[in-house]
């Protein structure tokens, strides 16, 4: 058989194989996975105690980037949380904004029920209208009970339906020691949470950058009242720590006689972002003192090391039946590891790439995982995604590649 016939037969066989596997992309990663060195140390496990106690019924501190627990004291005890409830209320509203279901500029008419709320409020009257953003600002800064009910009714049709969604969202977030009965935390039976659960929803809310404007604004004004009876209402942030504690940038205070003085506080210094929660303190000064003590401990003992920035490349992938043939597996998000100050133990990252993907591949599609280890212990796993689109290679392209491989 001459060379020409051999090539024709070989090409025909190749075509049959290519047809059989059309549409499936085989990822051929490099032989050696990329490992990235950084520094780390063991941090207190969830059941471990910090070397001091605070005067609170429940307390916790977490790394806001990873959720790693750095301090806890009765962190899972079910306790009343007063206006700290409003973290979940704000979360559902801002998620509705991000999902395009409502807009910050939408006008909300205040119902009689919303206007009748007692406690901290903006003293709005039934029938007046305010934007979603104005109401959110009032809730974040002045802890407005009337604003909570108005927003709940606008988003869900009624406060009751909105509360059902609050409990569903809590379940989705893994908040196992939480049950909501209303949107604002006014005293009612069977309404409770834990310091740990509050930290979880605080982390989630803080992901929404718009809310940070309201958390860190000390004073503002808004106009309230029916047409012809308008008046200026002053908003003063209930969280004094935003002016008293270095790096404090949120989040929410709370107080009722039953709950005591409560606070979920966020603070950032350089790359380290911590969230500390206290429940059931005896005075507002004690609440601020204990939160400050916890945060001081965190910043004194830990620092954040950036393992990868969003878009960092961990593998160059050969997509066998794709065009283009190459795509990078990159970090889908910024990845950090909290480490003890002064320690130099290594954190190692290892990329694992999926063996096959369905084509076409869209930029941002997950194609692997990045595992982060502290010694032998896995401390996190993060998605690796494609940094570009990969379409199915045409039959002609595949045949051309085959012949290129022969010569």
Residue ranges and their predicted role:
Residues 25-196, 200-209:
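Active-site-adjacent loops and short helices of periplasmic peptidoglycan-processing enzymes
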Residues 1-2, 175-176, 187-192, 196-407:
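Domain-terminus/edge residues, biased toward the C-terminal soluble/receptor-binding domains
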Residues 3-8, 81, 132, 395, ...:
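Structural motif marking the loop-to-transmembrane transition
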């Amino acid at each position: 058989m001459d060379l020409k016939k051999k090539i024709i037969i070989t090409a025909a066989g190749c075509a049959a194989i290519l047809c059989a596997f059309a549409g499936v992309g085989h990822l051929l990663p490099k032989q050696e996975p990329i490992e990235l060195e950084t520094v780390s140390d063991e941090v207190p496990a969830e059941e471990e105690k910090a070397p001091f106690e605070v005067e609170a019924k429940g307390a916790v501190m977490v790394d806001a980037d990873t959720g790693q627990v750095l301090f806890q004291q009765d962190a899972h005890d079910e306790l009343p949380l007063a206006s700290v409830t409003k973290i979940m209320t704000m979360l559902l509203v801002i998620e509705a904004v991000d999902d395009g279901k409502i807009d910050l500029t939408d006008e909300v008419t205040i119902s009689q029920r919303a206007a009748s709320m007692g406690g901290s409020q903006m003293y709005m009257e039934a029938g007046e209208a305010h934007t979603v953003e104005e109401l959110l600002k009032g809730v974040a800064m002045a802890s407005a009970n009337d604003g909570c009910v108005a927003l709940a009714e606008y988003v869900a049709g009624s406060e009751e339906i909105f509360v059902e969604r609050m409990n569903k969202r809590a379940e989705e977030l893994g908040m196992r020691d939480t049950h909501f009965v209303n949107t604002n935390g006014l005293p009612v039976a069977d309404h409770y949470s834990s310091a740990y659960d509050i930290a979880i929803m605080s982390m989630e809310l803080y992901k929404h950058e718009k809310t940070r404007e309201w958390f860190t604004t000390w004073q503002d004004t808004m106009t309230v009242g029916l047409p012809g009876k308008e008046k200026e209402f002053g908003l003063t942030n209930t969280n004094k720590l935003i002016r008293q504690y270095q790096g404090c940038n949120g989040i929410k205070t709370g107080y009722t006689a039953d709950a005591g003085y409560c606070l979920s506080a966020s603070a950032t210094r350089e790359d380290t972002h911590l969230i500390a929660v206290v429940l059931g303190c005896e005075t507002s000064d004690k609440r601020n003192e204990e939160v400050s003590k916890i945060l001081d401990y965190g910043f004194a003992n830990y620092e954040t090391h950036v393992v990868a920035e969003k878009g960092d490349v961990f593998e160059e992938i050969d997509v066998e039946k794709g065009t283009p043939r190459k795509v990078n597996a990159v970090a889908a998000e910024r990845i950090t590891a909290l480490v003890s100050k002064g320690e130099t133990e290594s954190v190692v990252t290892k990329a694992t790439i999926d063996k096959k993907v369905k084509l076409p591949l869209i930029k941002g599609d997950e194609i692997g995982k990045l595992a982060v280890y502290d010694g032998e212990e896995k401390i996190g796993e993060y998605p690796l995604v494609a940094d570009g689109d990969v379409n199915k290679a045409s039959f002609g392209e595949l045949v051309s590649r085959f012949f290129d491989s022969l010569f």
